Amino acid sequence: IEGIDLSNSMLEQARNKNIYNKLEHRDIVEYLSTEDLDFNYFISTDVFIYVGDLFDVFRLIKSRNKSRGKIAFSTEHTDKDGFVLEKSGRYSHSKKYIESLCEKFDYKLSYFKKTDLKKIRGKFIIGGLYLLDF
């Protein structure tokens, strides 16, 4: 299990769990561009809200991973087209946008659920939970 994050505090929390073989303080696109990728699963929770355009993430996983696999991830959800930078400073992504990336890079959308992800200042944040096969 490998973990990457830009937040030192999140990496410290991960380190304290003692389950990771490797932890790196890096940008996700840089990591996917430079590391040998041979994973069955990519799991990304509360990450894509800081990325916005997921084109390179989807492209790099599909083109650089040595085997077939699955991607499980969450997004903050929007019904607008594409992805939107919200007032919170986080990005939300539409299901239609994720489906367009799936079509472009030949991923299969196996599961989607719109749900309450978390509560911030007393208000639920609506998110999308996805499972893709590639």
Sequence positions of predicted segments:
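A short glycine-rich, Lys/Arg-flanked "PGG" loop and its adjoining helix->strand segment in the class I
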Residues: 55-70
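Short alpha-helix
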Residues: 90-106, 112
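Core SAM-dependent methyltransferase catalytic element
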Residues: 116-134
